[in-house]
Amino acid sequence: MVSIRRSFEAYVDDMNIITVLIPAEQKEIMTPPFRLETEITDFPLAVREEYSLEAKYKYVCVSDHPVTFGKIHCVRASSGHKTDLQIGAVIRTAAFDDEFYYDGELGAVYTADHTVFKVWAPAATSAAVKLSHPNKSGRTFQMTRLEKGVYAVTVTGDLHGYEYLFCICNNSEWMETVDQYAKAVTVNGEKGVVLRPDQMKWTAPLKPFSHPVDAVIYETHLRDFSIHENSGMINKGKYLALTETDTQTANGSSSGLAYVKELGVTHVELLPVNDFAGVDEEKPLDAYNWGYNPLHFFAPEGSYASNPHDPQTRKTELKQMINTLHQHGLRVILDVVFNHVYKRENSPFEKTVPGYFFRHDECGMPSNGTGVGNDIASERRMARKFIADCVVYWLEEYNVDGFRFDLLGILDIDTVLYMKEKATKAKPGILLFGEGWDLATPLPHEQKAALANAPRMPGIGFFNDMFRDAVKGNTFHLKATGFALGNGESAQAVMHGIAGSSGWKALAPIVPEPSQSINYVESHDNHTFWDKMSFALPQENDSRKRSRQRLAAAIILLAQGVPFIHSGQEFFRTKQGVENSYQSSDSINQLDWDRRETFKEDVHYIRRLISLRKAHPAFRLRSAADIQRHLECLTLKEHLIAYRLYDLDEVDEWKDIIVIHHASPDSVEWRLPNDIPYRLLCDPSGFQEDPTEIKKTVAVNGIGTVILYLASDLKSFA
């Protein structure tokens, strides 16, 4: 990049507004009138406003002749001094968006005879594509400007395996950039790569998933999942680890894919697998990263591939992994990061269309609601198109089954609804959910895709942090405790969560329908439940802490809504007290498969809870109206919640179900309603292999969950 020296500056800030900035010391020399010059003529600029700034003098001018984007313009002062006209705030106006919105295909479109390269760069005055091949000499092809600010060129020949970069001239400066739409990239994402469509056959097509509340989501990080020395997997830290079947720990316990299948979850959610920064793909074990540093949104990450130097390998192995999971009845959710990029100034977005894809504050500075230095301006039409195009691509090319949206609240509602429409048309039955936090980005509250606006986004789920904190205590206050940790003040909030957070008694609904409530007590973010509890209750022994975590898991897995489990939570995962392990070592982040063996009984307990939920629709009521009709709270005390699912003849094979959650080590006797005998399926000691008949009262001995049922066939149990 060559630095341009300018005697003064001029910017297009609206379709016919040009701002001229004169150095303060040159104010008496470079004076109005100003003229706008094109290659063939010039026009007068009328000064509408003028201001004295700290080091410059500002003139706001109006042109009767709108700027022709894609052409070189200059502004000349009365002194004869000239400067090139740069793209300013006009890039962020609705008029610009409307004039240059393009609904066609972008990127490299391959055929065996030729490849068409297209890039959307409406502010650019010139563009080219630079092609190279490891075994051949490179060439640069000038691109032609088409309508809507698209530059294109068709290059003949079979370009499979060719590397390419776009060269874009904005504001008189040439920049090389990777294609925003690159479907494959070289090692560490330095160039895009043209690949012919592969011949991957999906051998296990799954029917559209029935309903979000039927899901049990299991979140994991590819490297965490397999890197432990006792994981039993050969391809540690790689896509292929999840293609290995029947793996075991050293002592013969199931691990890997076999373990997840045995656990009974329905969906595996993977932390980002698109190309990200933070890990050198040539030396992947030298650093660690969760993957929330997005570089290239359409291309798979190379550090998880067996050969990061071969762009095809990462595509093939990722597809093999997804296909294998499908063969075993497991669906795949991708964690995607459309709210920010790794580094704004180096991103293909900024290099291609400076200032367009990111939000700016009222002073024209990049906003930082995400906390990482930039916010994607999803409300702009080409950003909206990009997000929808990307989601549809992963559905169609990689056959994934849903998306978890990082910092969903940064995005705007219209984009989320547009994306949902395109995505569900591409693949019905997918899950779409995310973090609906209300963050400080310059977007009106009513436009944010935040939890508070859930009623306007049917079909979109939200992480329910209120339910989470009611169960375990405030996530951001280490010593804070929730119901499962002995804080009886949270009982009512927990009961609201159990009822799907969609309105219980006089409480205002958090979400309008249970399918929009993602119920969890632990995720990759923040402390694990075990670590949080160890800080909050340092006096308690491990046995009692295990009981409390089992209680928390039972609350979530039996609640109305969509349950979500963090991998290893079922065997009390610890990160040694590290709160934010996004770039901590493998020793902190790895899934410790030794604990899977140590806590076999607890894993079995979680498996039985999942099995119970899947077997009985009463725990998966599909609407708020159904919950109001079939769920009632029987007891709500400081350390005891009892609720009943009833009138289930048309819902479940069980007629009646009672669940009791008890958070005190004391023993209590709880009286059954209506003196009807129930079968005791589960108590704090675990599941009963032969449920016994209970009359009048049931003993609740210590911390844990009691499950009773009434069926026409009293021998029926999960």
UniProtKB/Swiss-Prot annotation:
GO biological process: carbohydrate metabolic process
Family: Belongs to the glycosyl hydrolase 13 family.
Catalytic activity: Hydrolysis of (1->6)-alpha-D-glucosidic linkages in pullulan, amylopectin and glycogen, and in the alpha- and beta-limit dextrins of amylopectin and glycogen
Domain of life: Bacteria
Source organism of the structure: Bacillus subtilis (strain 168)
Family annotation (InterPro entries): Glyco_hydro_13_cat_dom, Glyco_hydro_13_N, Glyco_hydro_b, Glycoside_hydrolase_SF, Ig-like_fold, Ig_E-set, pulA_all-beta, PulA_N1
Enzyme class of the recorded protein, top EC level: hydrolase
pH dependence: Optimum pH is 6.0.
E.C. designation(s): 3.2.1.41
Annotated protein name in UniProt: Pullulanase
GO molecular function: pullulanase activity
Activity's thermal dependence: Optimum temperature is 40 degrees Celsius.
Active site residues per record: 406 (nucleophile), 435 (proton donor)
Coiled-coil stretches noted in the UniProt entry, renumbered to this chain: none
UniProt keyword Hydrolase, yes or no: yes
Keywords annotated in UniProt: Glycosidase, Hydrolase
